[in-house]
């Protein structure tokens, strides 16, 4: 499973890259606004850092506007993926952009049928929001299972990006189900490293090491 970072914070991206586990980045208008920096300045820096896919979102509600914005975003870098909302107008934009070779990521997906529509429209990626669905139903991961089954049944090439990830269990369950990608906040990625027994074991090893005579280092 690929690990994407859901952020527009360049420092977080740099740290994740140092760990050697970052495969891509997803952003949205909210994450961009939190940086307090000009849009193009932030995006340019991210695209220079990251080799993998970087999702950038359109803000228009009509297909014509999404297509126009999508083309502009695609010009910023070869690895740009255009995020499009799961609406009828959005699917029109997906068809147009994908026909031009511009990859799309259909976002704000909350049902298997929405994901099916996105795949039939030819979207490169689909982003089901598990955390937000858990908030109202507790069935976020069931959604991923159902989408994966549908895509497998009909051999769609659309990749599943598990989004709205709240905690490490979402990451674990995504991997167990076999999702293609999990995009997560930096704090969740950090938590994946942690286990109390790891800390206890390391502390014990270091204490025992101090007892070793004539240590080489």
UniProtKB/Swiss-Prot annotation:
> Which catalysed reactions does the entry list for this protein?
D-sedoheptulose 7-phosphate + D-glyceraldehyde 3-phosphate = D-erythrose 4-phosphate + beta-D-fructose 6-phosphate
**Molecular function terms in GO for this entry?**
aldehyde-lyase activity; transaldolase activity
State one Pfam family annotation: TAL_FSA
Q: Where in the cell is it found?
A: Cytoplasm
The main location is: cytoplasm
| This protein's pathway | Carbohydrate degradation; pentose phosphate pathway; D-glyceraldehyde 3-phosphate and beta-D-fructose 6-phosphate from D-ribose 5-phosphate and D-xylulose 5-phosphate (non-oxidative stage): step 2/3
The record, for CDD domains, names: Transaldolase_FSA (cd00956)
Transferase as a keyword of this entry, yes or no, is yes
InterPro entries, per the entry? Aldolase_TIM (IPR013785), TAL/FSA (IPR001585), Transaldolase_3B (IPR022999), Transaldolase_3B/F6P_aldolase (IPR004731), Transaldolase_AS (IPR018225), TSA/FSA_arc/bac (IPR033919)
EC number of the protein: 2.2.1.2
One of the protein's GO biological processes: carbohydrate metabolic process
State the active site.
83
Key words, A-Z: Cytoplasm, Pentose shunt, Schiff base, Transferase
PROSITE patterns from the xrefs?
TRANSALDOLASE_1 (PS01054)
Q: Got a GO cellular component term for this one?
A: cytoplasm
Keyword Transferase in the entry? The reply is yes
* Reported function: Transaldolase is important for the balance of metabolites in the pentose-phosphate pathway.
Its family remark reads: Belongs to the transaldolase family. Type 3B subfamily.
Name recorded for this polypeptide: Probable transaldolase
Q: What is the lineage of its organism?
A: Bacteria, Pseudomonadati, Aquificota, Aquificia, Aquificales
């Amino acid at each position: 499973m690929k690990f994407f970072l859901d952020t527009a914070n360049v420092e977080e991206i740099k740290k994740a890259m140092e760990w050697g586990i970052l495969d891509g980045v997803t952003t949205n208008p909210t994450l961009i606004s939190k940086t307090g920096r000009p849009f193009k300045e932030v995006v340019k820096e991210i695209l220079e850092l990251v080799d993998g896919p970087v999702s950038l979102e359109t803000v228009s509600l009509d297909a014509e506007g999404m297509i126009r914005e999508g083309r502009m975003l695609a010009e910023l870098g070869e690895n740009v993926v255009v995020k499009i909302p799961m609406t009828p107008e959005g699917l029109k934009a997906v068809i147009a952009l994908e026909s031009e070779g511009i990859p799309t990521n259909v976002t704000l997906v909350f049902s298997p049928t929405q994901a099916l529509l996105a795949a039939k429209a030819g979207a490169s990626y689909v982003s089901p929001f598990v955390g937000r669905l858990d908030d109202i139903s507790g069935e976020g991961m069931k959604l991923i299972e159902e989408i994966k089954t549908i895509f497998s049944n009909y051999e769609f090439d659309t990749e599943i990006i598990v989004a709205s990830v709240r905690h490490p269990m979402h990451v674990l369950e995504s991997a167990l189900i076999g999702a293609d990608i999990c995009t997560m906040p930096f704090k969740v990625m950090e938590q994946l490293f942690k286990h109390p027994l790891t800390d206890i074991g390391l502390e014990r090893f270091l204490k025992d090491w101090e007892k070793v005579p004539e240590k080489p280092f």
